[in-house]
Structures are given as C-alpha cells and as structure tokens.
Amino acid sequence: MAATTGLETLVDQIISVITNDGRNIVGVLKGFDQATNIILDESHERVFSTKEGVQQHVLGLYIIRGDNIGVIGELDEELDASLDFSKLRAHPLKPVVH
C-alpha cells in the first residue's frame, strides 16, 4: 500500500502554507510529490506588520520545497473574503527553530 500525505484532497483547492522561515503563502494547490514539494498557482504572499495592513505580494505559479514547509492548511474562501486585510495588524511569524 502506498503512503499518502493527505494532500490528495486539497489538489485544485486554495491552501495556506506557513514556511519554516515564517512566510505565509496562499494559492491553489496544483500538485505535489513524495517529498511534499508543492506547486501553487495564482499564489501570493501575505506580509504581516504591526504598523500597517497586510501586504499581498503576487507570486503567480510558485514551487515550495517540502523541507521548507511548516504547515499546510485548507483555506475557507468565504471567511477569507470577509476579512479586511488593510486593517489587519499582526506580528510577522518568526522562523521555526528546530
């Protein structure tokens, strides 16, 4: 029996990825491999700040190496669309320390 990562159900869905260096990248999961390298389409990075609203930097088609992924989660599109990111303030995430 082949091992599964649980990502199969997220293909073609909008996901949020927190990387080990503290970045938050959102996009449509297009594919992945056995090393959990992932391909995102229509992606953007959300940059958080305590002084100004969330900045969103367009990345487009983007590949993230599996060894740089901290967390992958499905995004609730309705809830996400209801947020006013221009008014949202938060401390940036710190890198993961092993």
UniProtKB/Swiss-Prot annotation:
Its main location: nucleus. Expressed in roots, leaves, stems, flowers and siliques. Belongs to the snRNP Sm proteins family. This is Sm-like protein LSM8. The gene is LSM8. Component of the heptameric LSM2-LSM8 complex that forms a seven-membered ring structure with a donut shape. The LSM subunits are arranged in the order LSM8, LSM2, LSM3, LSM6, LSM5, LSM7 and LSM4. LSM8 subunit interacts only with its two neighboring subunits, LSM2 and LSM4. Interacts with the prefoldin co-chaperone subunits PFD1, PFD2, PFD3, PFD4, PFD5 and PFD6. It comes from Arabidopsis thaliana. PROSITE patterns: SM. GO terms for cellular component: Lsm2-8 complex; nucleus; spliceosomal complex; U4/U6 x U5 tri-snRNP complex; U6 snRNP. Component of the nuclear LSM2-LSM8 complex which is involved splicing nuclear mRNAs. LSM2-LSM8 binds directly to the U6 small nuclear RNAs (snRNAs). LSM8 is essential for the formation of the nuclear LSM2-LSM8 complex involved in the accurate splicing of selected development-related mRNAs through the stabilization of the spliceosomal U6 snRNA. Plays a critical role in the regulation of development-related gene expression. GO terms for molecular function: RNA binding.
